[in-house]
Structures are given as C-alpha cells and as structure tokens.
A protein has these predicted regions:
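Short glycine-rich hinge loops at helix-strand junctions in the catalytic core
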Residues: 112, 130, 154
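Terminal substrate-recognition subdomain of acyl/acetyltransferases
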Residues: 2-16, 161-181
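Active-site acidic-Proline motif in GNAT/NAT acetyltransferases
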Residues: 105-107, 111, 141-142
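Long, low-complexity, intrinsically disordered N-terminal extensions of eukaryotic proteins, enriched
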Residues: 1-7, 37, 122
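Conserved active-site alpha-helix within GNAT-family acetyltransferase domains
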Residues: 115, 141-159
Length: 181
C-alpha cells in the first residue's frame, strides 16, 4: 500500500501481489484458456499450435493435457506423455513421463514463469504419479531461454541430442524425481 507521500520517512513501498503458479489437468472450464495460449511467431516451430496440441493430447490415451496457471488464470500448456518410448523414441529402463509442447503465452514470458511452472510440473508428477522416477523432454538446441528455464527447474542435459525434428537438433533433458516419503 502506498502512503500519500512515499518519499517521507517511514513511507511504505507497494509490494507486488505474490505470483502463485500451479498446474492442473485441462478441464472443460480451462480448455478455452488453453486454446487461447499463443507463442511468438518465432517460437511456433518449437511447440506448434496450442489448440492443435490440446486436441491431440485429449485424443491420445497415453497423454494428459495440462494447464499452467498464474493466480488461477491460464498462461501456458504442456502435455504429459506416458508412452514407454515417449519423447526420445526408446525405453529408458526406468519409469518415466515425457513432456511435450511446454509453452508459456508470449504475453507472460520474461517473468520467470517458465522455470517456476516447470518446477510445479515436476512436483505435480511426483505427487500424482509416485511410481515415476524420471521426466524427459527435448528442447531445441538454440532455445537458450528454454534450456535455462528447465535447468532452473532441476532438469539436466546429459549430453544426449536428438537430430532432425521439425525445428532441428534438440537437447534431451531429464529431471529425476525422488520417491515420496
């Protein structure tokens, strides 16, 4: 809250409202907000069209469409892939979940939401899928902002790359999930 004279001794400085980021399965109520998520044109080669990705996830029995919310408002989307060869096309020898089409709406980028959402995503998977020990995703090798956001959320790149793809070479990143106590 601002005092009338914010330069006076003892004046209080306005503190921004806390940003509460959480993730949730897409419901019919959240779906319109997810379909409205847009990335910048230069990013569309990395994640594609969100409305298409939502429809594709909802039609795949091995997928779960997820919304990223800030203070209850949809700002992003991703897809959990439960297939045994998800993301990298081969089995990993440990129970894992793939992450696809992770995106933050371009109007909400640059605020740290991506790394906080990725951390919330990992916590959600650990809580709702306690049998899973690993998350795996692929991120375009030139997407330095995305790579840094995933690293801040605990994902690591172990040197594996995937060639090809519609946007070019991608780093394979992993996030290990500790067992619940």
């Amino acid at each position: 809250m601002w005092d009338d004279d914010n330069n006076a001794p003892g004046a209080r400085i306005a503190m921004p409202a806390p940003v509460l980021i959480h993730v949730a399965p897409v419901t019919p109520t959240l779906a319109p907000g997810v379909r409205a998520v847009e990335v910048a044109p230069a990013q569309s080669a990395y994640v594609g069209n969100t409305a298409f990705n939502l429809l594709d996830a909802e039609s795949d029995a091995n997928s779960e469409a997820m919304a990223i919310l800030v203070n209850g408002r949809v700002i992003g989307f991703y897809r959990l892939d439960f297939g045994p060869r998800s993301v990298i096309g081969r089995e990993l020898g440990t129970p894992h979940i793939g992450v696809r089409a992770f995106c933050i709406d371009h109007r909400h980028q640059g605020r740290g939401h991506g790394s906080r959402a990725a951390a919330a995503m990992a916590e959600d998977v650990r809580r709702r899928h306690p049998d899973q020990r690993l998350m795996v995703l692929a991120v375009h090798a030139r997407n330095r902002v995305g790579i840094a956001a995933y690293q801040r959320a605990g994902f690591v790149h172990n040197g594996q790359y995937m060639s090809g793809g519609r946007a070019g070479p991608q780093l394979v990143m992993f996030r290990y999930l500790p067992a619940q106590r």
